[in-house]
Amino acid sequence: MIGIVSAYNDVLSAHQPMANYPAIIKDEVRKPAAVAQFAGGVPAICDGVTQGQPGMELSLFSRDVIAMSTAIALTHDLYDGAMMLGVCDKIVPGLLMGGLAFGQLPTIFMPAGPMPSGLSNKEKANIRKQHAEGKVAPDKLLEAEMAAYHTEGTCTFYGSANSNQMLLEAMGLMIPGAAFVQPNDPRRMLLTRAASARVVALTTTPEGIGEWTNERLLVNAIVALLATSGSTNHTMRWVAIARAAGFEMTWQDIDALSRVTPLLTGLYPNGEADVNEFNRVGGTAFLLRELLDAGLMHDDVDTVMGRGLSLYTRALGEIGADTHKLTYVPEVKRSQDLTVLRPVAEPFSTEGGLRLLKGNQGQAILKISAVSPEHRVITAPAHVFDMQIEVITACKANRVVADSVVIVRNRGPCACGMPELHQLTPALSVLLDRGLKVALITDGRMSGASGRVPAAIHVTPEAAAGGALTRIHDGDIVTVDCDSGTLHLHVDAATHLARSNAPTPAAKSGWGRELFAVFHDNISVADCGASIFGN
């Protein structure tokens, strides 16, 4: 008996294609005389849709809700295996955390794939920036957004959703090549059928996802994240996943791996390519082979296909004309475009895309690969805000006219659910284009596609918990040094500690936010996974 847990809904383009997956799975598992049931659905929130809206304050919490919903779906104790259908930021980590609570079950993940490329990410970002300057009308902005996000499938930039798929394939928890096949590609249905057949076969083996997910598999996931400069969100997501699997992972671990992991991709926001181009020029098969050959990943792991991550170094081929079955080509040994994907011997950088910053303000995460070298070091006065909209208003009113370190505090997990502050990117990018040196420091999140502006995010301890951010004043001199990994407030320690903590804005209610008060009271800090489990 196979249990299906799905994040299907009609709101998210990434999840809409999954409407017919349960029927396909049920049909396929009947062939070996098995049965599949739809065990349960889980919610799926899109941070792109909820940017700047009340729902963004529920986004972080939704991951743990999804984990609990997954556990409820599987708790009937009927199942011998599980199929997880999900794609986006919180959804895959939540499904994985919930699945690990049933570690005895063989479990396979199946995504829907990216939408075909539309308006390029570079053009989209430029129009957003022009709109922030008042040069593009709202209707033109809407046209651009509709041209970029124009059909079913995952967003094509390399943000949290596509990072999820990269990491799951690097962990061997999906069928090889499944990460980036588009929804309407005929291979997508065959991949879903192959996963269905495979999970039935795995029910005859003694091990499940709990045994597979060991420290080597977790390291492989983080190396894949760093080699592709994936989503900053996953510095919290995979810490929480590691804990669900029984391991402790720290930001120091991630930073240490980043120092020795080369950056091999030029995907937006680190470059101009999207995931469709990445898949076309070599994709995960090339990337994983390069990292394995360089000794940067563990091959001695168990995957849903069997022993060894090297099983994932063959590329998905075209469908056989006569067989209508999936085919694989031998190991991909050359990238078809070095502006998109490079070998270990010719990396974009000798270090990975994410960096840990530390100092007397706490510690923070930064996506260094998206920041040009000339913008990586700044010492400037602080401009302190509590809300994203306050920053945008100040920029529009030309109140930020000199080099500045913008502080947005009281946006952490216990303060207000750690919302993404991606609307800051266009506004602060305008300041960069005016020749100013600008950096951002916040205890909130940015998008998985954060770029251009040096953004020290996920600051911990957060302001609401008495962290240093709560005692920073306008005009204090602050240094953000991305290269050395330094975050420094140039205020005497005694003076800083003698200051009163700034008031924490009261958590807002309405739009369902009042239902999540228990999360505010019990959530762990960002570097421990920002989770209510095991705090």
Predicted regions mapped to residue ranges:
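Glycine-rich beta-alpha loop segments
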Residues: M18
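A short, small-residue-rich loop immediately preceding and capping a beta-strand
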Residues: L74-L95, I108-M110
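Contiguous domain-boundary segments centered on the initiation and propagation of an alpha-helix
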Residues: R63-A71, T75-A82, I392-V400, V405-I407
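N-terminal small/polar loop signature for handling phosphorylated ligands or for N-terminal nucleophile
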Residues: A39-D77
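Catalytic or ion-coupling anion/metal-binding cores of large enzyme and transporter domains
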Residues: M1-D10, A14, A23-V42, Q53-G55, ...
